[in-house]
């Protein structure tokens, strides 16, 4: 199921996703999505809820839902009223966590920590320890779509092992609510006061909001009683219209890659390649790692190349220098702590962008190196998996940490007025990254302040100097008082460039966007410096 939005708005520490007609806003809460409509004619707007519900262990029973309801009652959470008589949404499951007291504690979260051993076993059909993380929602900022999963992504909290969900426990549902939970109502108060009302059409047709159905079946609409028990049944007319999505049939495309001379180099690495998300083969990255420096830097590397290929060699050599400097004089940028050559860093940089289907010269770089390998008959050994993993994770986490800190800082309109020394390059990169994040979150309107640029620049300055991400986050947290930066970057340090599932896909997409934004401003700055 997909819900489209046009822009985002921060209101009372909640991220709201506003539709194109500005009459409806969504927000994520504990792996579920709430929808609130603009009040009209002194009447409250329609309130709806979308997401996964827990049901039972078979097609007919509701054992799991009853278990959750029973546990909520035993814990004295009488104010919590699951929607309907049979199903319980994921955000109610969150309340079984001892650290969560109300739905307000899990606002802006796409997943649910299930620490209850019995419930975790229901979800996975396996005994798990210490618990599992169940993800039901993904926000695709690039497409401006909130995606609700037909089947959740479930991973072990500690080992990140991925489980297959039990077949009957989860179902996708859509519910009409008479009101929001009491803990969430204050967060929505005054929301539409800051969103200009659209001009009403002359024909005054009833509004409708399309819900795109991408799964095998449409979710069953429910009329929530808001009391968790039997109530008076009444008919309701919803503004939501379910629309089935049918994939376009296309002919498969085949991507070509330069074959190296060594037969074992054409085989995918047995560990990394199987664990890697879809994208260009990792063996192509390994070719550049192994022979890229020689292909671009050797005095006779250009022999036998066409004029266009010679220009490409010069271009890649120049870009590696502009971004990362030289081995003897490295430039302050992402990946400063990695013991790699500028060409190797450039290859990883382009690979992380290219595998998310963004424009990148990575294929051209691979072709040049492949030509060099063939012309010189080089033997390319099997990929060094630890080296590739360390390189990709290092640059991936640096970029994701920088972008995540930018997102966190933009949540604060006012930051402490201090004079923090920041280098010109770090300041320029900070401004570019903040503008990119702002374009993904808010309507254009100058929400990036000099303080935002200064404090993100301070974070980048520590990172560019080769210090750790947590050290940079701690430094910035002390300057701003935003201690959540340390926790957020700690979460980034536990992520991997090879993570699968919705969370992994979202992290890869965001990282590619951050890398692309920084690449553009760095190359433009270097070009301007040359012209001056």
UniProtKB/Swiss-Prot annotation:
Q: Where in the cell is it found?
A: Virion tegument; Host cytoplasm; Host nucleus
Q: Where is this region: Disordered?
A: 251-276
Domain of life, source organism? Viruses
Q: Which cysteines are joined by disulfide bonds?
A: none
User: By its UniProt entry, which Pfam families does this protein fall under?
Assistant: Herpes_UL21
The similarity comment for this entry is: Belongs to the alphaherpesvirinae UL21 protein family.
- This chain belongs to the protein called Tegument protein UL21
Task: Look up and give the organism this protein is from.
Answer: Human herpesvirus 2 (strain HG52)
Q: What does this protein do?
A: May participate in DNA packaging/capsid maturation events. Promotes efficient incorporation of tegument proteins UL46, UL49, and US3 into virions. May also play a role in capsid transport to the trans-Golgi network (TGN).
Q: Give the Pro residues compositional bias ranges.
A: 257-276
Give the record's subunit note.
Answer: Interacts (via C-terminus) with UL16.
Q: Does the keyword Lyase apply?
A: no
Provide the leader sequence positions: none
Q: Which Gene Ontology cellular component annotation is one that this UniProt entry carries? A: viral tegument
């Amino acid at each position: 199921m997909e819900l489209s939005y046009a822009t985002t708005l921060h209101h009372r520490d909640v991220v709201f996703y506003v539709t194109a007609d500005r009459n409806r806003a969504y927000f994520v809460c504990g792996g579920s999505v709430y929808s609130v409509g603009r009040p009209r004619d002194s009447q409250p707007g329609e309130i709806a809820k979308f997401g996964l519900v827990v049901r039972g262990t078979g097609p007919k029973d509701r054992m799991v839902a009853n278990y959750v309801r029973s546990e909520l009652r035993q814990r004295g959470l009488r104010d919590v009223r699951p929607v309907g008589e049979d199903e319980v949404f994921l955000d109610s499951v969150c309340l079984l966590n001892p650290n969560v007291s109300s739905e307000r504690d899990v606002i802006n979260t796409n997943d649910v920590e299930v620490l209850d051993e019995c419930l975790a076993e229901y979800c996975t059909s396996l005994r798990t320890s210490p618990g599992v993380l169940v993800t039901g929602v993904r926000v695709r900022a690039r497409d401006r779509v909130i995606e609700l999963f037909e089947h959740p992504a479930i991973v072990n909290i500690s080992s990140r092992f991925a489980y297959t969900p039990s077949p009957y426990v989860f179902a996708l549902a859509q519910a009409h609510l008479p009101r929001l939970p009491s803990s969430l109502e204050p967060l929505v108060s005054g929301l539409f006061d800051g969103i200009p009302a659209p001009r009403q059409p002359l024909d005054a047709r009833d509004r409708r909001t399309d819900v795109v159905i991408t799964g095998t079946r449409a979710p069953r609409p429910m009329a929530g009683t808001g009391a968790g028990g039997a109530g008076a049944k009444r008919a309701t007319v919803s503004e939501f219209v379910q629309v089935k999505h049918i994939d376009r049939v296309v002919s498969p495309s085949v991507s070509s890659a330069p074959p190296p001379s060594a037969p074992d180099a054409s085989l995918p690495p047995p560990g990394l390649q199987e664990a890697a998300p879809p994208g260009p083969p990792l063996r192509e990255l390994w070719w550049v790692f192994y022979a890229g420096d020689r292909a671009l830097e050797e005095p006779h590397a250009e022999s036998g190349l066409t004029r266009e290929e010679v220009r490409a060699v010069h271009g890649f050599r120049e870009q590696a220098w502009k971004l990362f400097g030289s081995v003897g004089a490295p430039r302050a940028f992402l990946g400063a702590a990695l013991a790699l050559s500028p060409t190797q860093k450039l290859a990883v940089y382009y690979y992380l962008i290219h595998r998310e289907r963004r424009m990148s010269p990575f294929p051209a770089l691979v072709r040049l190196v492949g030509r060099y390998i063939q012309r010189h008959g080089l033997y390319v050994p099997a990929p060094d998996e630890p080296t590739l993993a360390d390189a990709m994770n290092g640059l991936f986490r640096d970029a994701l940490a920088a972008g995540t800190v930018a997102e966190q800082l933009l949540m604060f309109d006012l930051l402490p007025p201090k004079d923090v020394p920041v280098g010109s390059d770090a300041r320029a990169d900070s401004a570019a990254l903040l503008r990119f994040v702002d374009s993904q979150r808010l309507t254009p309107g100058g929400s990036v302040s000099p303080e935002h640029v200064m404090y993100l620049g301070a974070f980048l300055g520590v990172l560019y100097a080769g210090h750790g991400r947590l050290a940079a986050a701690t430094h910035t947290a002390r300057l701003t008082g935003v201690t959540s930066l340390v926790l957020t970057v700690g979460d980034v340090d536990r992520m991997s460039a090879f993570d699968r599932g919705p969370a992994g896909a979202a992290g890869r997409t965001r990282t590619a966007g951050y890398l692309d934004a920084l690449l553009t401003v760095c190359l433009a700055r270097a070009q301007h410096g040359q012209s001056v």
